[in-house]
């Protein structure tokens, strides 16, 4: 019913209220890619860490698969800001009621920030592993290393292959 009203009144109201326009609104496009390092899609390692890069800074966390496998995270050990990491270097650990798991750097770079909220609330890793439960932020010294990581689709296929 509301659709019919909008369809009839949309052309009349659209000039006064752009939100009622029937034309699809195209969102602003931001260039994606490792060349500019403005914004990259989330990439994954075979050790279940992810990284998303914006303006040359990578945000690192663990995948949903990893947090489900770990169970309730009760403690996070993270590096100090300024720590220099090479790709695949161990940079910390997560402890859960089930197990402990080391964390590995997806890229070469320097730690610029840690998620201090995890000290008081490590369960954020479980509740919001791709948003509030991020672990560290780091510079991206070798952008070509991003190409060695898996896309989200490739990671999902990887997960299915190890589950079978």
Curated annotation (Swiss-Prot):
Question: What PROSITE patterns does the record point to?
Answer: BIOTINYL_LIPOYL, LIPOYL
Transit peptide as recorded in UniProt: 1-39
Which InterPro entries does this chain map to? 2-oxoA_DH_lipoyl-BS (IPR003016), Biotin_lipoyl (IPR000089), GCV_H (IPR002930), GCV_H/Fam206 (IPR033753), GCV_H_sub (IPR017453), Single_hybrid_motif (IPR011053)
Q: Which GO terms describe its cellular component?
A: glycine cleavage complex; mitochondrion
Pfam families linked: GCV_H
Q: Any idea which residues bear N6-lipoyllysine here?
A: 98
UniProt keyword annotation of Transmembrane helix present: no
**Record bears the keyword Cell division:** no
**Protein location:** Mitochondrion
| Gene Ontology terms: biological process | glycine decarboxylation via glycine cleavage system; protein lipoylation
> What are the residue boundaries of the Lipoyl-binding domain, all occurrences included?
57-139
Chief place of localization: mitochondrion
Keyword annotations of the record: Lipoyl, Mitochondrion, Transit peptide
Bound how, and how many: what does the cofactor note say?
Answer: Binds 1 lipoyl cofactor covalently.
Q: What does this protein do?
A: The glycine cleavage system catalyzes the degradation of glycine. The H protein (GCSH) shuttles the methylamine group of glycine from the P protein (GLDC) to the T protein (GCST). Has a pivotal role in the lipoylation of enzymes involved in cellular energetics such as the mitochondrial dihydrolipoyllysine-residue acetyltransferase component of pyruvate dehydrogenase complex (DLAT), and the mitochondrial dihydrolipoyllysine-residue succinyltransferase component of 2-oxoglutarate dehydrogenase complex (DLST).
Q: How does it assemble?
A: The glycine cleavage system is composed of four proteins: P (GLDC), T (GCST), L (DLD) and H (GCSH). Interacts with GLDC.
Q: What is this protein called?
A: Glycine cleavage system H protein, mitochondrial
Organism source for this protein?
Gallus gallus (Chicken)
């Amino acid at each position: 019913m509301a659709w019919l009203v909008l369809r009839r009144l949309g052309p009349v109201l659209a000039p006064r209220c752009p939100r009622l326009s029937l034309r699809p609104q195209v969102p602003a496009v931001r260039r994606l890619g490792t060349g500019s390092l403005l914004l990259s899609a989330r990439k994954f390692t075979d050790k279940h860490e992810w990284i998303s890069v914006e303006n040359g800074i990578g945000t690192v966390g663990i995948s949903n698969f990893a947090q489900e496998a770990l169970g309730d995270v009760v403690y996070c050990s993270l590096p100090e800001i300024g720590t220099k990491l090479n790709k695949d270097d161990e940079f910390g650990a997560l402890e859960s009621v089930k197990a402990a798991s080391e964390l590995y750097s997806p890229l070469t770079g320097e730690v610029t920030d840690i998620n201090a909220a995890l000290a008081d609330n490590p369960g954020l890793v479980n509740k919001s592993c791709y948003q509030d439960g991020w672990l560290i932020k780091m510079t991206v010294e070798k952008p070509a290393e991003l190409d060695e990581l898996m896309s989200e689709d490739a990671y999902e296929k990887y997960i299915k292959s190890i589950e079978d």
